[in-house]
Design a protein with these regions (language model features):
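Short, flexible catalytic-loop segment of classical short-chain dehydrogenase/reductase
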Residues: 27, 44, 65-76
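Residue(s) in the substrate-gating loop at a strand-loop-helix junction
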Residues: 23
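Active-site loop immediately N-terminal to the catalytic Tyr-X3-Lys motif
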Residues: 28-34, 56-57, 93, 111
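A conserved structural motif in NAD(P)-dependent oxidoreductases
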Residues: 90-101, 112
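Short C-terminal tail/terminal secondary-structure segment
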Residues: 28, 105-106, 117-132
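Conserved SDR Rossmann-fold cofactor-binding beta-strand/turn motif
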Residues: 60-66, 70, 109-112, 122-124
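Active-site helix of classical SDR
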Residues: 2, 39, 47
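Alpha-helical segment proximal to the catalytic Tyr-Lys
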Residues: 7, 52-56, 114
Length: 132
């Protein structure tokens, strides 16, 4: 998708922005999800590589790395004792809500980030700066 987008923008000499959705697990590993963490780490490096390659064409490439977010799939986990204990270890003492991704996404999609490329924005309630 990124390649097709970039080719189209380059052919038209139009600027653009690509926003990848990575994960904090691309920066910090945990047990039992090796394939997931490897794929997200790869996506972070792809973001940086594409940013370098596409900058001269005025195409910015950035990523958002969400932490733990409540979804329909995992909502019941966060109600368990293990889930509540994990939430207590997140500095903001809560998991993310999908609306928490709106601001960072709008930032990266707008001209407010015109001088950002190759960046990865962590949206994790402070998870990565804690000693979880």
């Amino acid at each position: 998708v990124a390649r097709a987008f970039a080719h189209r923008r380059i052919a038209r000499a139009e600027p653009g922005t690509i926003i990848n959705i990575a994960s904090i697990l691309g920066k910090r590993v945990t047990g039992g999800v090796a394939a997931y963490t490897a794929s997200k780490a790869g996506l972070i490096q792809l973001t940086k590589s594409l940013a370098l390659e596409l900058a001269r064409y005025r195409i910015r490439v950035n990523a958002i790395a969400p932490g733990y977010f409540e979804t329909d799939i995992n909502a019941s986990f966060f109600e368990t004792d293990a889930g509540k204990a994990m939430i207590k270890r997140i500095p903001q003492r809560r998991v993310g809500r999908l609306a928490d991704l709106d601001g960072p996404t709008l930032l990266l999609a707008s001209d407010a980030s015109a001088y950002m490329t190759g960046s990865v924005i962590d949206v994790d309630g402070g998870h990565l700066v804690s000693s979880l």
